[in-house]
Curated annotation (Swiss-Prot):
Chain residue ranges for the region called Disordered: 1-22
Organism whose genome encodes this protein: Homo sapiens (Human)
Highest taxon in the source lineage: Eukaryota
One Pfam match: Histone
Name the record gives this protein: Histone H2A type 2-C
Length: 129
């Protein structure tokens, strides 16, 4: 006989996602699908979506950590767009990367030009005498 009868063959291994294989939280399969559907290239290698998902995950974690620090500095427990704006604009590299990006409800960085500040005069010393 061929040996393919009712003998209990090896059970199929549990499916493991490419994200878990790579140790990522971001979806490698979805990134791969979007790369294929986006007409960026005729073919997409197997490593490209893994690398791209890892880069996206790293950038997201970096921004969220800085935004969480900004929220904590403002004594808040929830990150709002203002905290994202402060985090990105105060970080030199992220500001360069996202320089042309507008964040809705983000506001602006607090900045007063030095010439507009009141001058420190000698009158304070004269009053104390």
């Amino acid at each position: 006989m061929s040996g393919r009868g009712k003998q209990g063959g090896k059970a199929r291994a549990k499916a493991k996602s490419r994200s878990s294989r790579a140790g990522l939280q971001f979806p490698v399969g979805r990134v791969h699908r979007l790369l294929r559907k986006g007409n960026y290239a005729e073919r997409v290698g197997a490593g490209a979506p893994v690398y791209m998902a890892a880069v996206l995950e790293y950038l997201t974690a970096e921004i969220l950590e800085l935004a969480g620090n900004a929220a904590r500095d403002n004594k808040k427990t929830r990150i709002i767009p203002r905290h994202l704006q402060l985090a990105i604009r105060n970080d030199e590299e992220l500001n360069k990367l996202l320089g042309k990006v507008t964040i809705a409800q983000g506001g602006v960085l607090p900045n007063i030009q030095a010439v507009l500040l009141p001058k420190k005069t000698e009158s304070h010393k004269a009053k104390s005498k």
